[in-house]
Regions:
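Catalytic core of pol beta-like nucleotidyltransferases
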Residues: 1-26, 32-38, 49-106
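Short beta-strand->loop micro-motif that forms the acidic, two-metal-ion catalytic signature
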Residues: 42-47
Length: 106
């Protein structure tokens, strides 16, 4: 897909369709910073409001995004964390960078 804004809109819609209502979906990395190349991947962060992750979370919540991207010859790198895990990692450079660059999609 040539239009990044349209693709971001589709990501947001898919997030609203597949994620629980209390989940968050963020775009981060080069696509969020506006420094992406045409072949850059899409970095997505899914935050679930659960006590702990379940073995089915990736298939249920992340896989639909990778499938959508593959249909458009794009690559999505989804990361899933619980909100509790995310807070526990707040001191890490990864979390600080994501929090700085993120675009909230859901």
């Amino acid at each position: 897909m040539s239009n990044s804004r349209q693709f971001i809109g589709r990501l947001s819609k898919l997030g609203r369709d597949v994620l629980p209502s209390n989940a968050a979906l963020w775009l981060y990395g080069s696509r969020a910073r506006g420094t992406a190349q045409a072949d850059s991947d899409w970095d997505l962060l899914i935050l679930l409001d659960e006590d702990q992750q379940k073995s089915t979370d990736f298939e249920k919540y992340a896989y639909p995004f990778t499938l959508m991207a593959a249909e458009d010859n794009q690559m999505i790198i989804p990361q899933i964390y619980t909100k509790k895990q995310w807070k526990q990692m707040a001191f890490t450079p990864f979390v600080k960078n994501v929090e700085h660059d993120k675009i909230v999609l859901v």
